[in-house]
Amino acid sequence: MGDIVQNTNFIAGTKVSSIGVNSTTCDRDSTNTTAASSQSVKYLGLTTAYTSASGTKSIIIGGTFANNTDSEVELTVHLYDNSASATPAIVSRIPVPNGSSFVLRDTGKTVMEEFDGIRVYCDTANAIDVQLGILKGVN
């Protein structure tokens, strides 16, 4: 649960909320009007790239997300807000060409409270190298 659903019939950022024996439930409705059996749906697992330490705050300065594969990949980055149990998207479904990178800057100096985190989703396993600029220990 918590994986992102990647399909043209789901809004970017749609997540799996529960998994049953014969079904998967998402946190948003599909825009598709045909049966799910006739479509391909991909689930992207998350990687937590950073978690703010207990009792402190951190500020995201920026980051570089490098594609280390021979193919284009798609990248989504979320900020996990532990106090609200919410994960707003910082960027969603960004294409990163092979041998290239996506640079995150001017994030408005986003403040992360304790246990908040940066979560990275990619449509190809182990395809993105992440380097984050974070100011730690802010009170």
Language model features: what each stretch is:
Residues 12-17, 111-115, 127-132:
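Short, Lys/Arg- and Gly-enriched loop/turn segments at beta-strand edges
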Residues 4, 8-11, 44-58, 62-68, ...:
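C-terminal interaction-tip segments
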Residues 3-44:
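Small/polar beta-strand repeat architecture
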Residues 3, 14, 39, 56, ...:
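Surface-exposed loop/turn positions
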Residues 27, 78-82, 135:
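Predominantly extracellular/luminal cell-surface or secreted proteins
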Residues 20-23, 29-33, 68-71, 82-85, ...:
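Acidic glycine-/aspartate-rich tracts in secreted/extracellular proteins
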Residues 83-117:
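Intrinsically disordered, low-complexity Pro/Gly/Ser/Thr-rich segments with frequent PxxP/GP/PP motifs
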